[in-house]
Each structure stands twice: as C-alpha cells, then as structure tokens.
Design a protein with these regions (language model features):
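Active-site-adjacent beta-strand anchor residues
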Residues: 76, 131, 515-516, 541
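Transmembrane helical cores of multi-pass ion-transport proteins
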Residues: 1-427, 432, 530
Length: 558
C-alpha cells in the first residue's frame, strides 16, 4: 500500500548537502532577505498594520515554509495578493479578527494538504486566477494614490468608485515634494534592473529617497514629506506569543474570510512552486507545501503577523542568485531577523510616498495585463468568467469574486461537458464500428417496435435533458428502448436520477428499457444506487446483440 508522504524537502536535501551548496544558499539567502525587507514593510503598511508586523510575518513564515515545505526553493512571506483581504478584514473585524481568520486559514491549509487537495487546487480555472489577480493589482494601485502624491484627505472611502471620486476632488491638495519622491521611486525601481540584476530596485529607491527626504528636511526645511515614523511607532522588539480568545460566533463569522485566505494562499504558493519547478527542473510535493503553508499561517499571527504564502518574486530572486535548497530560505529568514533587531528603528525615516512607489511597481507586476489581453481573445465563456471575477474584485471584495467566479466557471464547465455528450438514434441496422464480431452481423437488425439510442460521453444532467428531448421528438411509442452505453465513462447522481425517472415513466407507458454495454465503473455506480431494482437485472446486457435478442423476446410477448 502506498504511504502518504509528507516529508519536507529539507530532509532529502541534507543527505547530500556540502560546502558548495551552503555557499550558494548563503549568498542567495542574504540577497533574498534584503529584497524581502522593503516588500515586507510595504505590504504590512498597505494591509493596515504596522511595518514590523510585515517583517515578523516574513521571518516566521519564511522560516517555516523553508523548514517544512514541499519545494526546495520556495520563499514564503507576506504578498501583495493579501493586501486587499487583510485590509477588509481589519476594517470589519479588527486586528483580533484578522488573527483568528489567519489561524483558521492555517487549519484549512493543513487540511487541504492532509486530504491531498494539492493537485485539485491547481485546476482552479485560469480566467478566475487572472481575473482576481488583476483586480487585486488595480485595487492595490488605487489604495496608494493618496500617499504617492501626498493628498490631504481625512478619510478615504472604502468603495472603489467613491475612492477615485475623492482623489479627483482632492487632487489640488497634492504635495509637490511627496509627488517627486513617489514618482522618482517608481523610476528608480523600474530602471535599476537595467544596471544590475543583483541589487533590488526597491531597496535602492528606499535608501536614495530616505536620504533625500532627510537632507531636504535638514537643509531646506521641507517637512511635508510624511514618513513611516510620522504614522507609526516603529519597534524592534520581538512580540510575545499571544493566543486570541475565540468564540463560536466569531469563528462562524470568519469562515468565509478565512477560506478566502486559505484558497488564495494555496493557489499562489502552488503557482509559485510550479513556476520554480520549471526553472530548475524539479518537482515539488503540493500536499507537503500546503501543510507547511498552513503551519506558517498558524504560527505567524501568534507573533502578531499577517497571512503569508509563497512569493513568486522572492522565489525567482532566490533561484537567480543560486539558491537550490531550503537552507537558502532559512538564511533569508535569519537575515531578516538580524535586520529587524539591529536596524528596524531606521525604518521610521522611510517616506510613505516611496513605499507607495514600491507598491505601484508591485501592482504593475501583479496585473498580468498580457495574460488579461490574451484571455479576451478566448471563447466568450472564459471572457465572461474573467471580467466578472475582475470587476467583482475591485467593486466588492475578493471573497465574493472567488465564490461567484467559481460558481460561474462550474456552470460553464458543466454546460461544455453536456455539449460534448452526444446522443444519437440508430434507425435501421447497427453496422458501424461495433463491439461484436462480423459473424454476428445478422443479429443486428433492429426489430419493429424497438428504438436504439447510443450515448457517447459522460451521462449527467445536461446529457439527460438532451436524451429526453430526442426521445420526445419521436411520435410513435415503441415497445422497447435500448440504451447503448458502451462509450459512457461515468454517470453522476443527476444522471442516475434521470435514468430512474425514465424507467418509471417508460414502465407507466408500457415501454421496457434495456441497457447495453455498461462499463464496470458505471455498472458499479448504478448497482450502488439500486437502479437495477427498478430496471431488472434481466434488462442489463453486456453487448448490443444480446440487447437486441432481449428486445425481440419482449416484443414477442407483447
């Protein structure tokens, strides 16, 4: 019996680990830690929490994902995809609500892994993924306009449309120096890769703009550039572990947000791991990765952190700088911890406009406009799912977008599946490719009073409706209906219900149903549903020639 393997990749790595591997991982871990720093701060603030919570998340989640994960090079931490969800949860349920929702999401992720749902999650329709990712990107960009241009607004509306109306009404309050810092930050981040692939543009922008803001304040008396320290009390103290008080009412109210965090985290982490596999030629264990992500999201909020997942940008940075084992991810977490302990107080000098610039670039990278445009050329059903998910994300929230998007995608999928199932009527002789030998061809003439139908494809509710319509189109009432099912791979509960109704209606009309060529799988499903109690075992035939013989016997008696 095959065992359920949830062994972390780290254990296999250590068997053949050597000094050369360590030196590569050390360099990659240091660079990824430096890259993760400004992103963790920016994601924390944009999510509505303090900057240190973003870094704490990167440390705790980054360490645990690398320690327990199913990917050798995955880097975990806070990501832009969670900004919208976290901000919405805090607004509605407060920080404690976010903590409980994140813990619940961690439990869900662990269950996903234990139930081996890792491969299934990968099947979430691509238009939904692109739709909500693009919607999140637009939302992140929208939330940064105030800080990017230094607008004077007491309270920014939460509604997307109202937010933009507010920005337009207050754009005259834009601060020149904040705008310069924000725009220059975007430019620096965008052009840095042209000069160096190793140095993260976001770090360069933060260093340059922080120094510039300090010089402008010191020597030019310009104090209008708001910094992190103006908005938050920055601390480098490691928070104590705090377990929130959970009530049944709170848990019930947070199921939907927690499930959204879990599903989004699962999608993003497995997508990141899959992309990384393609680059280094490896294969991750999806279920182990989900368990690791779950543990990370259980632990992170206990230290005051926020939801975390696998981060594609940091994972690719890890690969590009030589990281090939989980040790690189662990080193990245240690580097972040050292920076947090010794340099965190300096973060208070970072301009808010600069962080807004960092997030503008993040939102551009997330939007995936090329994929969006490409999908717009796909079938209308895909375009419908894409646009509905996209607009629901920016107008309402991600929870609604994913739920509605999945429902619509499922309905459209079922419609497509029903269209692939073909029901045809055989009028005179059965002489096409057959499941019997040519020697028995004389037995294949259809007797008077007998109708033969052949179903090709899965038999479920869509096919059942099609079948009923075809039968209703015949004016004459036969004595026997043979349903040939040799090409039916499976039948669902709706299909069984449809067949049951068909048998009962036919019996009332004096018509006998005979099944032919039922596969072992479908036979087992029908038997389990006690369908044969209605039909009768004598009306189940393994081949069409036997079904025709049975039909002749029934007709002769009537």
């Amino acid at each position: 019996m095959k065992t359920f393997d949830l062994k972390p990749q780290l254990f296999d790595t250590l068997k053949s680990y050597n000094k050369k591997n360590f030196m590569s991982d050390l360099m990659a871990g240091i660079i990824v830690g430096i890259v993760a720093l400004p992103l963790a701060i920016a994601f924390g603030i944009a999510s509505g929490v303090t900057p240190e919570k973003g870094i704490i998340t990167a440390i705790v989640a980054g360490f645990l994902v690398s320690l327990l994960g199913g990917s050798k090079i995955q880097i975990g931490g806070p990501t832009g995809a969670f900004i919208v969800i976290i901000y919405g949860i805090i607004q509605k349920y407060g920080i404690e609500g976010l903590t409980i929702a994140t813990i619940m999401a961690g439990v869900f992720l662990i269950l996903f892994g234990l139930l081996k749902l890792g491969t299934i999650i990968k099947y979430i329709p691509y238009p939904i993924v692109v739709g909500f990712t693009s919607g999140i990107a637009v939302t992140i960009f929208t939330t940064q306009i105030k800080d990017l241009f230094g607008l004077t607004i007491d309270s920014v509306p939460s509604d997307f449309v109202e937010k933009w109306i507010c920005y337009i009404q207050h754009f005259s309050t834009a601060d020149l120096w904040c705008s310069l810092v924000g725009v220059l930050s975007v430019i620096i981040i965008a052009i840095t890769p042209k000069f160096s692939k190793k140095i993260p543009g976001s770090l360069v922008a933060i260093i340059v703009m922080t120094i510039a803001a300090l010089l402008l304040k010191q020597y030019a008396g310009i104090t209008s550039i708001e910094t992190i320290g103006d908005r938050f009390n920055v601390s480098n103290a490691i928070p104590d572990v705090q377990v929130p008080v959970m009530t049944w009412e709170t848990i019930k109210s947070l199921v939907a947000p927690a499930m959204t965090i879990a599903v989004l985290g699962a999608i993003e982490s497995l997508l990141s791991a899959t992309v990384a596999d393609g680059v280094i030629g490896d294969h991750h264990n999806s279920n182990t990765e989900l368990v690791a992500q779950g543990v990370a999201n259980l632990a992170s909020p206990l230290f005051g952190g926020i939801p975390a997942t696998g981060a594609i940008a940091r994972t690719m940075t890890n690969i590009n700088n030589g990281g090939r084992t989980p040790i690189a991810g662990i080193i990245h977490a240690v580097v972040l911890l050292l920076i947090f302990l010794f340099f965190m107080p300096l973060a208070k000098y970072i301009p808010m406009a600069c962080l807004a610039g960092v997030l503008v670039i993040v939102s551009y990278g997330m939007c995936g406009w090329r994929s969006f445009v490409a999908l717009m050329k796909n079938p209308k059903s895909d375009v419908t799912v894409l646009l509905i998910t996209f607009f629901l994300t920016i107008i309402f929230d991600l929870t609604v977008a994913i739920e509605v998007g999945l429902i619509i995608a499922c309905l459209l999928f079922m419609k497509r599946m029903s269209e692939t199932t073909d029901v045809k009527v055989i009028m005179d002789e059965i002489n096409e490719e057959s499941d019997i030998s040519k020697g028995n061809i004389e037995h294949l003439t259809i007797p008077d009073g007998v109708e033969v139908y052949e179903i090709n494809g899965p038999y479920f509710f869509g096919a059942g409706n099609k079948f009923e319509e075809i039968m209703a189109s015949f004016g004459d009432r036969p004595k026997v209906r043979i349903i040939r099912m040799r090409k039916v791979p499976f039948v669902d509960s709706t299909g069984i219900h449809n067949l049951t109704n068909l048998c009962e209606m036919s019996k009332n009309e004096g018509i006998t149903i005979v099944l032919s060529g039922v596969s072992e799988k479908v036979h087992a499903q029908l038997q389990k549903a006690r369908f044969y109690d209605i039909l009768g075992e004598e009306n189940i035939c393994s081949h069409i020639n036997l079904a025709l013989e049975r039909a002749k016997e029934i007709v002769s008696k009537k």
